[in-house]
Amino acid sequence: MTTTLLLGIAILCSASVVPDSDMPLKNSPTEPLGYIDTLSIQESIVRSNFSSDAGSPLRLKTLDKETLSFRGASRTYPELLNGIPSLYATSESGSYGDAKLNIRGFGQSNIAVTLNGIPISGLVSGNMYWNNWMGLADATYAIQVQKGVGSSFLTDGSVGGTINIVTEVPDEKFEAEAGIYGSFYGTVKAFLKIGSGNLPKGWSVNLMASYVGGDGYVDATKVNSFAYMLNVCKTLGTDHKLIFTALGSPEQHEQRGTRLSWEEVQKYGLRYNRNWGLRDGQAFNLNLNNYFKPYFTLQHIWRGERFSMKNSVYVTVGNGGGRWSENKSTPILYRSKDGLIDWDGVIATNRETEDGQALSILSDYMAGHTYFGAISSMEYRLDGGWTIGAGIHYQYYSTWENEKISDLLGGEWWYEDYEHTSLAGLASRNPVKTVGDYIRTDNGKVTNHGTAYLSAGWRSEKVTVNFGASVFGASTRRWDKYNYYGGDVWSPLAGGVGGSIKAGALYKIGRGHSLYVNGGWYSRLPYSNVWFASGNNEISRDVKNEMNAMGEAGWRWVWNSGALELTGYASLWKDKSLMSNAYKVENSLDVKYMVTGLDAFHCGVEFEIRQRIADWIRLSAFASVGNWKWMNDVSATIYDHYSGNALGDINVYCAGLPVGDAPQTQIGADLDIDIPAGFGLNLNWRFNNRMYADFDPVTRTNPDDRTPSYRFPSYHLLGAQLSWTRRKSHPEDVGCRIFLGGNNLLDSVYIERGKDGASHNLESFRGYWGFGRNFSFGLCLSF
């Protein structure tokens, strides 16, 4: 009843209101679904546009540079997108840089991410590690969120949607920008951007550098990150352009890696982090992450009167890891009276062992990859409103990971129990290890992935139709020097073929009204961590392509001072595969099992409305209501890793359980007021409800337990930002913007993320609570 009332209030309050600058109102041409020219680089460097918000058969939302700057202080990159219906982004654990994103109830592995038209989601699990892209917010020109199928045929992960990111390149004139953002709890960001404008012989250069440092909101979560971006553009004649981009963000940040109980939050507060303590009088965090992922692209864009082509090559080499711990029995449990790790107690215990063997140690868990690829896409405009397109994409992805002892914590040596941790057994290896020695893991994967597509589109004054199909194939091999020491370290080849079909149509009724419909079908290959889910070179049994069928229909109404959009969607996700945690089988060691054939159904309604009430006031509101559930119970067979013999069957009972990890009801509103003398005020309100704790379906093995995972209490968030802006009226002027913002002004206590417990209630739940009331500030100068 409360949700229905709030939804009604949101719609009524905004019934006479609608869009602002981040919802373009002009009916610009729409690119065909197959053509992935998502760049809109200052309209002159690259004529490759985002899909038009007003003329596309997709549910879109575009955030421009000014909007992103307005939201950017002390937030992770995905959090810039909050306020879009059915999208939920948080900092995950509260650590700076760690973030998590859901769209329409689907997690990151079902959300495609492209950067300047190039897919950047990982091929191992489909996830995005946003801390590897910390500086991206300062280099972004615009972001477009495409719900559902998306416009790209070069990514096969767009089930929830696609995030298209476009970085800045030089404009025609010289420009420079510098600024400093910060939070009152200690995080500070400084940045500098310089654009050369047009230089002789068709050259232009853009440079960005930024730094983030200081304390996070959560205790002992310092951050130290530098970011850079270089763009060099060369115009060749009237139709050709070359764009070279280099960007990266070497970073180090402390983390909160352990979820909290409600009892701990009540006792120690929202900032509590149980992963640190004092060591030699200094704060010392058990979890410290560092990573550097330099990224390079070279793009050639040829745009003629009828024929257009875009060619891209890219390469990135990632390297980094994090502080880890290994223990002989239980994790580090020594606690001081204030709930922190008692490092002195841990060290004393290691020193008291008779033979000097360490019971607990620290290690560096390292991971890296080499990732390169090439894309070629083309489009030809025919007579009669027809357009045809085609493209190919090749990706090579090689990963590695290992673990190295970094600190014996007062001990003299560590015993590596090869007999129980390695499939090869001892294999003549020395089990006595010390600082600098490798333990526990030394493996990686090599994946080759290729995609090809064909598309077509037809457009008249009132009708737009787009359709196309793609085929993709991949092969993966895994190597493991730890489990197969002294033998063949390579696995057999795993892989397969998949495909997709997409189509969309829009009809302009007249007077700003239009109706649209789109749909798609995917047969998506398993990610490499599904093929090799058991931690060794054995290929997972009975794994099939995931099938995704989705569709949406909507009504869009655009008028001079506003816009309204209403969309209904449905997505069927079939044959999901999940690997269980360790499971005890009678007369056998703990084993894992692969659950296949899980199905889920996501459907819902989204509403958004915006209105410029007067020249000085704008009001917008949105609402989304979803119904996301697991559909079926499934069975799994447990196999012995050594013999391959079946050990037994196990059943998983998920039918009818709500999907967790994102709110199924969202309502929000924004009020923007222009005050005389350059001042501006933004007020924003968000309401989240019907959010269930995340859970692993494979843990639901009790046929009598059909209780949904823990349902979080609903909550309201109120924010505000006061700004003063002095715009440039002449090229010689200096523009200035100063702002002061506040988040969670009501100081609401709410849960952002977490895992369900055995009792499916607050007592057994473990998770992360949101930030309390906090404030941010910023100063930005433009030249």
Task: Please describe what each predicted stretch is.
Residues 387-510:
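Signature of Gram-negative outer-membrane beta-barrel scaffolds
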Residues 258, 475-482, 493, 506-552, ...:
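Surface-exposed extracellular loop regions of Gram-negative outer-membrane beta-barrel proteins
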Residues 247-249, 506, 517, 549-551, ...:
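Conserved C-terminal beta-signal and adjacent last beta-strands/turns
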Residues 100, 119-147, 166-168, 271:
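Short acidic/polar hinge/loop motifs at secondary-structure boundaries
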Residues 459-462, 568-572, 593-697, 780:
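Gram-negative outer-membrane beta-barrel transporters
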Residues 17-69, 108:
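Short, acidic, small-residue-rich periplasmic hinge/interaction motif at the N-terminus
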Residues 57, 78-119, 135, 141:
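Extracytoplasmic beta-strand/coil segments of soluble accessory domains associated
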Residues 149-152, 162-198, 209-219:
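Short strand-turn segments of transmembrane beta-barrel domains in outer membranes
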